[in-house]
């Protein structure tokens, strides 16, 4: 048996399971390890990595793109209705993401930051950019405050793990870009007023 020198984290609902693996082992072996070492009991789980469903059970983990410290999403398959035949079709990752509470929670975190920026920081930002104070000390204080609050939101976004999801990565990137533009505009305004 090969030495298991790498670790992957399985995200299953709101639970996290670190699993020791050898990246040369097959997906089938990983699933067997999951059943042995975790509370996951369903043999027919669906695994997703980087937004793609892992289906080829004979492929090695490294061939599937997994690395040390990779995060894998594990979901239960929906129970089949009576009389329907189980089909081995590729399920698009976005649908799986929309149904998974982990992805919903992460999307909610991103949206909460966006709402905070819109409701709390945008009025301060607009006031500073459109009506900067004539008092240099007050203007500098406003700039430092709005810059600090915007940077805090960037740090929060940086801490949001999108689990390899392209959709969530895009949402986070859009919000980072929006906040960065606001910061750039604050800096530009302070330079124009100082000139």
From Swiss-Prot:
SUBUNIT field: Binds to the ATPase domain of HSP70/HSC chaperones.
Record protein name field: BAG family molecular chaperone regulator 1A
Pfam families: BAG, ubiquitin
Gene behind the chain: bag101
Its job: Inhibits the chaperone activity of HSP70/HSC70 by promoting substrate release.
Domain BAG: 109-190
UniProt domain Ubiquitin-like: residue ranges: 6-72
UniProt cross-references to PANTHER family, sorted A to Z: BAG FAMILY MOLECULAR CHAPERONE REGULATOR 1 (PTHR12329:SF16), BCL2-ASSOCIATED ATHANOGENE (PTHR12329)
GO molecular function: adenyl-nucleotide exchange factor activity; protein-folding chaperone binding
Keywords: Chaperone
Gene Ontology cellular-component terms listed: cytoplasm; cytosol; membrane; nucleolus; nucleus
Biased amino acid composition, Basic and acidic residues: 83-98
Protein's GO biological process: protein folding; protein stabilization
Region Disordered: start-end pairs: 78-98
């Amino acid at each position: 048996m090969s030495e298991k020198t790498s670790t992957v984290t399985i995200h299953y609902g709101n639970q996290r399971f670190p699993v020791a693996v050898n990246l040369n082992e097959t997906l089938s072996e990983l699933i067997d390890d999951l059943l042995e070492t975790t509370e996951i009991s369903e043999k027919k789980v669906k695994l997703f990595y980087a937004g793609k469903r892992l289906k080829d059970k004979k492929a090695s983990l490294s061939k599937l793109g997994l690395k040390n410290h990779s995060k894998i999403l594990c979901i239960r398959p929906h129970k089949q209705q009576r009389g329907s035949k189980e089909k081995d079709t590729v399920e698009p990752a976005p649908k799986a993401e929309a149904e998974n509470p982990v992805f919903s929670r992460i999307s909610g975190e991103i949206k909460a930051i966006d709402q905070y920026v819109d409701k709390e920081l945008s009025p301060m930002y607009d006031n500073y950019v459109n009506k900067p104070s004539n008092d240099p000390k007050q203007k500098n204080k406003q700039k430092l405050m709005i810059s600090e609050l915007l940077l805090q939101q960037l740090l929060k976004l940086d801490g949001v793990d999108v689990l390899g999801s392209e959709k969530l990565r895009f949402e986070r990137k859009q919000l980072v870009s929006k906040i960065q533009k606001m910061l750039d505009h604050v800096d530009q305004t302070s330079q124009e007023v100082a000139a």
